């Protein structure tokens, strides 16, 4: 295992990152989901968790917000554990689309109708692959899986769920299109409801760092010492995060920062330095690709100072 940075160093770098970017007001909240548009854009929280279970925080790390697309990583992890990694390749795809996260064109352009599990089309299809005889059973298993990563019981932000359910016509169209190509593996209404619910799960910055630390520790939870995933599946999840975690900006992120990462339009980003640490940052203002601007800058700074680039 790679050596984790020392405690005083990590906390000092978190403090520096917070003060360096706390006055950055560039970007704006996601506005196509009304509940997200209302979130205070000034929130800024940073958290790091090491494979040894040490937790370092700065800023608004206890403020709940919706996990949004960061949930896709953990749903992918469960699907891999249940179905095996080759099923993901065969039934979803793992190549970057190079297009927006909610693109329909990505499906049409690929003759195999292959996308990846970290864009909306692939993520909704991944939900349809999960075990569960009905909506209640499938959601119960998925939410329990999230709880294991967070090491606590998580809940759904019902206002976000309602807001997204009322505005998810585009995702429904994606699911119907996938169904027409035999690339969707269950009832559209049922699986779209679960997907929308997973995106509405409430987390804090600290929660996300704890959840991502399982990937930094090769599938073993640093706080419980329990193995949640096989090491092979961890490697594959991190690979997809590297190529598609920040949507059409993923290549630039890999070039600049060099860490597997995943963003969400709620303002969170997680990044993983295998064997060293996981970092999560929350700041609601986004760039045009749907990635938090301050979170990107803060993680870039932290990764550089901790010499964490994996390439």
From Swiss-Prot:
Pfam families assigned? Glutaminase
**Any one GO MF annotation of this record:** glutaminase activity
Positions binding substrate in this chain are 69, 120, 164, 171, 195, 247, 265
- Which keywords does UniProt give here? Hydrolase
Its EC number is 3.5.1.2
The Gene Ontology biological process terms listed for this entry are:
glutamate biosynthetic process; glutamine catabolic process
Q: What class of enzyme is it?
A: hydrolase
Per its record, the protein catalyses: L-glutamine + H2O = L-glutamate + NH4(+)
Its domain of life reads Bacteria
- Hydrolase listed as a keyword: yes
- Say which family it is in: Belongs to the glutaminase family.
Subunit-structure text: Homotetramer.
| PANTHER family the UniProt entry points to | GLUTAMINASE, GLUTAMINASE 1
Name the HAMAP family for this protein: Glutaminase (MF_00313)
UniProt name for this protein:
Glutaminase
Gene encoding this polypeptide? glsA
């Amino acid at each position: 295992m790679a050596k984790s940075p020392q405690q005083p160093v990590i906390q000092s770098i978190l403090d520096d990152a917070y003060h360096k970017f706390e006055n950055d007001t560039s970007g704006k909240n996601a506005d196509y989901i009304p509940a997200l548009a209302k979130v205070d854009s000034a929130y800024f929280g940073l958290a790091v968790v090491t494979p040894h279970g040490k937790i370092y925080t700065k800023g608004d790390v206890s403020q709940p917000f919706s996990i949004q697309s960061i949930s896709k990583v953990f749903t992918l992890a469960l699907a891999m554990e249940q179905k095996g990694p080759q099923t993901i390749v065969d039934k979803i795809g793992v190549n970057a689309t190079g297009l927006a996260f909610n693109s329909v064109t990505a499906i049409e352009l690929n003759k195999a109708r292959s996308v990846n599990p970290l864009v909306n089309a692939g993520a909704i299809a991944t939900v349809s692959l999960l075990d569960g005889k009905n909506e209640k059973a499938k959601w119960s298993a998925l939410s329990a899986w999230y709880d294991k990563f967070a090491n606590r019981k998580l809940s759904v932000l019902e206002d976000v769920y309602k807001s997204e359910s009322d505005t998810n016509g585009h995702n429904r169209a994606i699911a119907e299109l996938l169904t027409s190509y035999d690339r969707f593996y269950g009832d559209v209404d049922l699986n779209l409801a679960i997907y929308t619910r997973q995106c509405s799960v409430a987390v804090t910055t600290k929660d996300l760092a704890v959840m991502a630390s399982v990937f930094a520790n090769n599938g073993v939870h640093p706080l419980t010492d329990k193995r949640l995933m096989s090491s092979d599946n961890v490697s594959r999840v991190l690979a997809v995060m590297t190529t598609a975690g920040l949507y059409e900006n993923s290549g630039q992120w890999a070039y600049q920062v060099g860490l597997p990462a995943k963003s969400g339009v709620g303002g969170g980003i997680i990044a993983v330095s295998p064997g060293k640490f996981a970092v999560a940052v929350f700041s609601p203002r986004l760039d045009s690709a749907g990635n938090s601007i301050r979170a990107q800058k803060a993680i870039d700074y932290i990764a550089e100072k901790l010499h964490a680039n994996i390439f």
